[in-house]
Amino acid sequence: MSISLNYSATRDPLSALGLDVGNRRIGVAGSDRLGLLATGLGVIQRRSLSEDIAQVQEWIRRRQATVVVVGIPLLADGSVGSQARKVQRFVRALQVAVDLPIVTVNEYLSTAQAEWDLREAGIPAKAQKGLIDQQSAAVILQTWLDERRASLSEVPAWQSWGNKDYAGEV
């Protein structure tokens, strides 16, 4: 089964919701209406798939999201491991539940980037624990926003990361 999760870049205002789906928590981030900046918004404590999807739907409603961006934790070589397969299952369930484009991006090293961002912001290590998931979601969403902006400005492909669909087949 293959899922098409493309979202065409336009110059229209957007409200993107970014998700970092983990085993215990889902980090949530949102974009500004211009699609320039991603900000961590909060964390969903995972309970069951149906409850998790309902919580995401509530975030979508509150933020009036027009697209959802989900990080897929590919391995260093770009292959799909067990954690990526779990996230792919979540993405398929979310696709059934919401009538919005869902885009996936490779989230490789997003947690490391989030930890670095928090450290650079002067957040003590103990305080980072509660913020890391939402900051990871912000890193994932910012990656997509940057790729989208590059495609809108018609930057040559070699200058942008490109926008791949990592939902794959399971």
UniProtKB/Swiss-Prot annotation:
Enzyme class: hydrolase
Keywords for this protein: Cytoplasm, Hydrolase, Nuclease, Ribosome biogenesis
E.C. number(s) listed in UniProt: 3.1.-.-
Keyword Transferase attached: no
Domain of life: Bacteria
Pfam families in the record: RuvX
Recorded GO CC terms: cytosol
Molecular-function annotations in GO: nuclease activity
The name this protein goes by in its record: Putative pre-16S rRNA nuclease
UniProt source species: Synechococcus sp. (strain JA-2-3B'a(2-13))
